[in-house]
């Protein structure tokens, strides 16, 4: 038997040196071919990994909760200090706020990934980020509550609810709480956290010298931090420079300057940071901790390793004189003193009032007889020295109620932004106010169309003069904005007719305007004469796409009916935040053979990323690409990948011709983004892109393509395409779930 792993490194107990890993330790294929396409991203959270079973309905279970009783149980946890991890100031509230914040604060608006929605803080890498030191203890403190309520309360909901209860228990009135977050059972490996291979590294993500350009889509300036280094950029204690980093990272979380100030000041009204000694005293993180640690990381060899000896960030800062009560104390101390830089007991840069001011005004976290001075982080002082943050901070200081309202709203946004529309919110504390960042969609105020009216509308669409390509590409443009990450986008709302979507390059604005005008004419005419039953523009776009698919299938010899369920609403321009929706604009869309400029990864990787956001499986991605190609849905009617002599006909020709032996593919230029296939005579037969050729090149995708290229697959291809198409059209129909 081998020796146990080195506790200082958290090393693997199986000594393999330079050997390939055992399958239980990871895949050898990634070692041999590190650039291989990772199609496991299209098989997230498989049913076989879910101990709750496929029939489990979390929403139904959550609705049976006695939420006040749950909150009372959490309150009991907050005020019952445990010897194994004593509470600062006798109250775990600040720890729970940090846990909830760090659960939600990984969200980034650019791709909707991160956030609190699936309880990812329980898994690597988040459970072991340097910024999450000791949050394993917060979750263990909550285990009795989770154990009591079991299936009725997810960890994802519990972590956010605990943050809310913590605020309320310390005298703050929150804006509301919504449940509905469903736990995942594995790490979300589809999130790109950065290229650095060392914790707190920033050398790969920061470029541009003093301009400090942060790599997209990242939301933090250092690997393993939620936002920024609290000591300042790369540990340099410069509040002015830190303000730039704060603005960039909070902006990438969809927070404006006022929300940013409110969040930082509100969060730092409570509790303290921990840096009793240098972090060299800490052992391996949670994921690397030895077996006997049972998932608790960062064993602290300094003193008792807890209480007054705790080490987390390595900074030792308490901001206010009432760290377990809501107050305006943060701003009072921020503006009430001039600060000087010094190194705290943990060796980190922090700030204290000059000339010994403030001594004896702040309580010690564990010794009631001891009083200390308030301290500040470099990033706290940014709120005082930055020309934009300073007047906001001063206004909040002078208007405490305005500050409280701003923090309540910003906290609710922070903890709910990744949940999608308010239709997904559960529980008695859901606020009634409509917020624009929720992408509100009015519910239809009319009777929905039935089978007879649907048939009539389909006839009008078919006679409108719009082509299969126009019908299909418009419906795809509307529906494919959906992101499974934060549940934004989709056809519901009919925002394809509004800015910014109607002007996106990928949507070919001139052609789109024609389709919109034609469909609006059909809608107006129908609604004027249909009595009580009416159709929304959003419904009409999806119905029209289905008409296009049906026409193409019929041309191929198959009589199919594309499913259609009315009930979508039409949003207004006033309900649409143009800046926020700009983040949904595709910079590439392999389904339409559209590739923008400036991408760090080859096209096929972007296709998989897009399919992941659309929650597609590898077969669904494959059949949709093959179908959309022969339907002519390419950007600007490009011939790339249209491997058929019968465009507009829903055949399996894409796969048949791609896999046809005897053709020779060659890149058309040094970029290797477009290719030509020549036959034995040397004549160019087809042209294609990386989006296309990957289905013949990648061994896994080729295996799927072979299914659809087979002689007996013509009908299967059509049926599978319709099923995948219908899935995409309804991804945002949370009312149907």
Swiss-Prot record:
It comes from the Bacteria. Binds 1 heme b (iron(II)-protoporphyrin IX) group per dimer. The active site is at 102 (proton acceptor). There is a cross-link at residues 101-227 (Tryptophyl-tyrosyl-methioninium (Trp-Tyr) (with M-253)). SUPFAM superfamilies: Heme-dependent peroxidases. There is a cross-link at residues 227-253 (Tryptophyl-tyrosyl-methioninium (Tyr-Met) (with W-101)). Residues 1-29 are annotated as: Disordered. Keywords: Heme, Hydrogen peroxide, Iron, Metal-binding, Oxidoreductase, Peroxidase. GO terms for molecular function: catalase activity; heme binding; metal ion binding. GO terms for biological process: cellular response to hydrogen peroxide; hydrogen peroxide catabolic process. Homodimer or homotetramer. This is Catalase-peroxidase. The gene is katG.
């Amino acid at each position: 038997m081998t020796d146990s792993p080195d506790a200082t490194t958290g090393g693997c107990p199986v000594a393999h040196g330079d050997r390939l890993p055992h399958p239980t330790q990871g895949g050898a294929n990634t070692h041999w071919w590190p650039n291989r396409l990772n199609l496991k991203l299209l098989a997230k959270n498989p049913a076989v990994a879910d101990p709750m079973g496929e029939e489990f309905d979390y929403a139904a279970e959550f609705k049976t909760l006695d939420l006040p009783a749950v909150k009372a149980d959490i309150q009991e946890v907050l005020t019952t200090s445990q010897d194994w991890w004593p509470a600062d100031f006798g109250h775990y509230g600040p720890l729970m706020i940090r846990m909830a914040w760090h659960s939600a604060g990984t969200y980034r608006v650019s791709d909707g990934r991160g956030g609190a929605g699936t309880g990812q803080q329980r898994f690597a890498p988040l459970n072991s980020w340097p910024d999450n030191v000791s949050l394993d203890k917060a979750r263990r403190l909550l285990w009795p509550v989770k154990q009591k309520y079991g299936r009725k309360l997810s960890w994802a909901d519990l972590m956010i609810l605990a943050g809310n209860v913590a605020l309320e228990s310390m005298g703050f009135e929150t804006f509301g709480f919504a449940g509905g977050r469903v736990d995942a059972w594995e790490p979300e490996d589809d999130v790109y956290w950065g290229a650095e291979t060392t914790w707190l590294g920033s050398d790969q993500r920061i470029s541009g010298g003093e301009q400090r350009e942060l790599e997209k889509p990242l939301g933090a300036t250092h690997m393993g931090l939620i936002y920024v280094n609290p000591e300042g950029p790369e540990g340099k204690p410069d509040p002015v420079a830190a303000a730039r980093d704060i603005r960039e990272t909070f902006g990438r979380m969809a927070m404006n300057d006022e929300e940013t100030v409110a969040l930082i000041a509100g969060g730092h009204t409570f509790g303290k940071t921990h840096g009793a000694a240098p972090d060299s005293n800490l052992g391996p993180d949670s994921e690397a901790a030895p077996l006997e640690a049972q998932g608790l990381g960062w064993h602290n060899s300094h003193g008792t390793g807890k209480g007054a000896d705790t080490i987390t960030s390595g900074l030792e800062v308490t901001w206010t004189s009432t760290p377990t009560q809501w107050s305006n104390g943060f701003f009072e101390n921020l503006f009430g003193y001039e600060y000087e830089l010094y190194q705290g007991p943990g060796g980190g840069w922090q700030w204290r009032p000059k000339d010994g001011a403030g001594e004896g005004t702040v309580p010690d976290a564990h010794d009631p007889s001891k009083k200390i001075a308030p301290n500040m982080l470099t990033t706290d002082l940014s709120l005082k020295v930055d020309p934009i943050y300073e007047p906001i901070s001063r206004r909040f200081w002078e208007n405490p109620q305005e500050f409280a309202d701003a923090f309540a709203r910003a906290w609710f946004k922070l903890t709910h932004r990744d949940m999608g529309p308010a239709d997904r919110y559960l529980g008695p504390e859901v606020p009634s106010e409509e917020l624009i960042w929720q992408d509100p969609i009015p519910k239809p105020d009319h009777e929905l169309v039935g089978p007879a009216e649907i048939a009539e509308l389909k006839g009008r669409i078919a006679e409108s003069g719009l082509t299969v390509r126009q019908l299909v590409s418009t419906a795809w443009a509307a529906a494919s904005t959906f992101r499974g990450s934060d549940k934004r986008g989709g056809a519901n709302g009919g925002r394809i007719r509004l800015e910014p979507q109607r002007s996106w390059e990928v949507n070919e604005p001139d052609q789109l305007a024609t389709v919109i005008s034609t469909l609006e004419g059909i809608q107006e005419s129908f609604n004027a004469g249909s009595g009580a039953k009416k159709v929304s523009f959003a419904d009409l776009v999806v119905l029209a796409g289905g008409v296009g698919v049906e026409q193409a299938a019929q041309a191929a010899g198959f009589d199919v009916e594309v499913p259609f369920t009315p009930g979508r609403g039409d949003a207004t321009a006033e309900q649409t935040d143009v800046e926020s929706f700009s983040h949904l604009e595709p910079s590439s869309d392999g389904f339409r053979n559209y590739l923008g400029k400036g991408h760090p990864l080859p096209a096929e990787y972007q296709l998989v990323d897009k399919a992941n956001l659309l929650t597609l499986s590898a077969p669904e991605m494959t059949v949709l690409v093959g179908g959309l190609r022969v339907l002519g849905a390419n950007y600007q009617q490009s011939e790339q990948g249209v491997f058929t002599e019968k465009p507009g006909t829903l055949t399996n020709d894409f796969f048949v011709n791609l896999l046809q032996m005897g053709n020779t593919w060659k890149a058309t230029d040094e970029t290797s983004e477009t290719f030509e296939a020549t036959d034995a005579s040397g004549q160019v037969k087809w042209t294609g892109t990386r989006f296309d050729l990957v289905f013949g090149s990648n061994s896994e995708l080729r295996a799927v393509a072979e299914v659809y290229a087979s002689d007996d697959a013509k009908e299967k291809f059509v049926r599978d395409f319709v099923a995948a198409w219908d899935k995409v059209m309804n991804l945002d129909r949370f009312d149907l779930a």
